[in-house]
Swiss-Prot record:
Catalytic activity: GTP + H2O = GDP + phosphate + H(+)
Family: Belongs to the TRAFAC class translation factor GTPase superfamily. Classic translation factor GTPase family. EF-Tu/EF-1A subfamily.
The organism's place on the tree of life at top rank: Bacteria
Gene designation per UniProt: tuf
Name of the protein in its database record: Elongation factor Tu
């Protein structure tokens, strides 16, 4: 089959499958690509193509992730599926594949299992905003009451972790039947219902360029006669010449004005998300700005030192620590472009954290960082990455 040309006519959404091992995440991923390809074009992926997920590196951590894409009537989706539980933990914490919504796959025969619960908790902690449920293997459950019971259990579990359990779409089906071309209620029909749920329940995400302006400071120069130039890559939003901006983090927040935007040595009237630019600041001295701060739209982001986080600690094989760490461990936290020292407080029931674990922690930094929930960071010791984390909740 000839490869179709990729047309950016439909809005793009990132999703992924989550759930307990052997509940059918990869089979469902294969079924979605197969059924939607028949209907809307694209490229079907077989189970073994998805299961042999290539290794990637994100923040120095090796993760196996399979990426597939498919289209529905209204949208283009990029979908991630991970072979092993550890890959999910790493993927969600590093944000290697950020999800606008997740498809929770739960076997109707088993009901919610430990990883079902852990993936819902992780989704909550790392800020996955929406979950849709695919109740899989319904062909192997004859008892309608049992199905209802499993559905209730899943809804209760979602509500427990602050997802709207009662309003969450739950699609009942069999990924295996759909993959085999079964056109019945549990086969292709269920996949089409799932596609419809994706289209209607997950809102189209805000594009980076529509957000409030934010640029992490990478470098600062002084240009005689012109003032101070700050360089970096615009993370989101747009900055226009003449606009007021704030310098946030590390030191007290100050306001300044953008008097010029340069890209590839050319002057522009604005810089936008994705651009590598130099921004000229009026009346700002070179020593007023440093790497690790951000330039931002006034009032859009604030500096903090105290927060809770979900972290993954690298195993020894991944180049992480060889020994556990304990309460009050003081590593460096690498946010965007710089390291800040901080101390870690472990949960009451945790005496120590072993390499390869994931854990919820509380952190106190020695200097404030421009921060919002969902911000990713690395944990380092002497320049070497020993963990990855995401801000779950700001405390101060």
């Amino acid at each position: 089959m000839a490869k179709g040309k990729f047309e950016r006519t439909k809005p793009h959404v990132n999703v992924g499958t989550i759930g307990h091992v052997d509940h059918g995440k990869t089979t469902l991923t294969a079924a979605i690509t197969t059924v939607l390809t028949k209907k809307f074009g694209g490229e079907a992926k077989a189970y073994d193509q998805i299961d042999a997920a290539p290794e990637e590196k994100a923040r120095g951590i090796t993760i196996n992730t399979a990426h597939v894409e498919y289209e529905t009537a209204n949208r283009h989706y990029a979908h991630v599926d991970c072979p092993g539980h550890a890959d999910y933990v790493k993927n969600m914490i590093t944000g290697a594949a950020q999800m606008d919504g997740a498809i929770l796959v739960c076997s109707a025969a088993d009901g919610p299992m430990p990883q079902t619960r852990e993936h819902i908790l992780l989704a909550r902690q790392v800020g996955v905003p929406y979950i849709i449920v695919f109740l899989n293997k319904c062909d192997s459950v004859d008892d309608a009451e049992l199905l209802e019971l499993v559905e209730m259990e899943v809804r209760e579990l979602l509500s427990k972790y602050d997802f709207p359990g009662d309003d969450t779409p739950i699609v009942k089906g069999s990924a295996k039947l759909a993959l085999e071309g079964d056109t019945g209620e549990l086969g292709e029909v269920a996949i089409m219902s799932l596609a419809d749920a994706l289209d209607t329940y997950i809102p189209t995400p805000e594009r980076a360029v529509d957000g409030a302006f934010l640029m992490p400071v990478e470098d600062v120069f002084s240009i005689s006669g012109r003032g101070t130039v700050v360089t970096g890559r615009v993370e989101r939003g747009i900055v226009k010449v003449g606009e007021e901006i704030e310098i946030v983090g590390i030191k007290p927040t100050v306001k300044t004005t953008c008097t010029g935007v340069e890209m590839f040595r050319k002057l522009l009237d604005q810089g936008q998300a994705g651009d590598n630019v130099g921004i000229l600041l009026r009346g700002t001295k070179r020593e007023d700005v440093e790497r690790g701060q951000v330039l931002a739209k006034p009032g859009s982001i604030t500096p903090h030192t105290h927060f809770t986080a979900e972290v993954y600690v690298l195993s020894k094989d991944e180049g992480g620590r060889h020994t556990p760490f304990f309460n009050n461990y003081r590593p460096q936290f690498y946010f965007r472009t710089t390291d800040v020292t901080g101390s870690i407080e472990l949960p009451k029931d945790k005496e120590m954290v072993m390499p390869g674990d994931n854990v919820s922690i509380t952190v106190k930094l020695i200097a404030p960082i421009a921060m919002e929930e969902g911000l990713r960071f690395a944990i380092r010791e002497g320049g070497r990455t020993v963990g990855a984390g995401v801000v779950a909740k700001i405390l101060d």
